[in-house]
């Protein structure tokens, strides 16, 4: 059977390179000051989507992301790996969204796309670590949902069979479509870019990124429709401004503090009985042990 699949993906700050300017005074992430990457667990979700596409002829995979214009890089990365297209939600009114406002915007976009058979997304984004957006989108769209998925094993008779991680082990679950699945980081890693697809889609862009008329490559977008990445605003997805961005975000950050890790004084032990006895006493006194 053919499947209509949407992958929720996010461009996130690389938290391995966080500096003193990582946060704004308002308590939101200063994305301009941090290098951006494809959210790791969203890549795991993309791989599951691409495997389903291979197993079910005539299926399609589209990437949906919300962010500034540079977030189209996430969609291009998906195209380079085998996705069929993408949608960029970009509007100043989306800025500063918490999980509630983010899930509202994504749900509105999915309604515009047409509710797919399967929505896939990473368990959580590394910039927030909430694991809330996927379940919230499912709730807003009244979709079945399974979280902490490690593999999508089978699609049959309008149902999906998945393996999911639970406390103390794994669980095999069957659930009817349409369905939203959130995928763990211990699922199969995403395949690398395909060189032919990189050459095909390297100039894929949203209208906001387009070169001016008369510049090199500008005419390609008329001749090659597949290079166009759909770009939607709040109005395009029939969104309510009161539920978008900061206006629709009840989560408020009380304070932000930059923490600088400094090397502490070290102590060298010789291994003598006296040193070991002294160390044990120190650990007991500090309640580290005992």
Per-segment meaning from a language model:
Residues 1-290:
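N-terminal glycine-rich FAD/FM-binding segment characteristic of electron-transfer flavoproteins
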């Amino acid at each position: 059977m053919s499947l209509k699949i949407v992958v929720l993906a996010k461009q996130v700050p690389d938290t391995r390179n966080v500096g003193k300017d990582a946060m704004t005074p308002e308590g939101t992430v200063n994305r301009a000051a941090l290098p951006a990457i494809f959210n790791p667990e969203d890549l795991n979700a993309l791989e599951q989507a691409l495997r389903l596409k291979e197993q079910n002829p005539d299926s399609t995979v589209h990437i949906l992301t919300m962010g500034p214009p540079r977030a189209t890089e996430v969609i291009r990365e998906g195209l380079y790996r085998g996705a069929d297209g993408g949608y960029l939600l970009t509007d100043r009114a989306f800025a500063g969204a918490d999980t509630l406002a983010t899930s509202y915007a994504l749900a509105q976009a999915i309604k515009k796309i047409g509710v797919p058979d399967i929505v896939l997304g990473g368990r959580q984004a590394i910039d927030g670590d909430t694991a809330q957006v996927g379940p919230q989108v499912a709730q807003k769209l009244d979709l079945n949902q399974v979280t902490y998925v490690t593999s999508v094993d089978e699609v049959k008779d309008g149902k999906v069979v998945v393996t999911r991680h639970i406390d103390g082990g794994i669980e095999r679950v069957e659930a009817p479509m349409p369905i939203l699945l959130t995928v763990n980081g211990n699922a199969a890693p995403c395949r690398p870019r395909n060189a032919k697809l990189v050459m095909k889609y390297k100039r894929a862009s949203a209208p906001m990124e387009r070169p001016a008329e008369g510049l090199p490559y500008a005419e390609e977008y008329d001749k090659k429709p597949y290079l166009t990445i759909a770009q939607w605003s709040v109005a395009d997805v029939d969104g309510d401004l009161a539920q978008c961005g900061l206006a629709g975000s009840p989560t408020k950050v009380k304070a932000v503090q930059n923490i600088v890790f400094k090397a502490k004084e070290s102590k060298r032990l010789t291994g003598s009985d006296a040193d070991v006895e002294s160390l044990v006493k120190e650990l007991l006194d500090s309640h580290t042990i005992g």
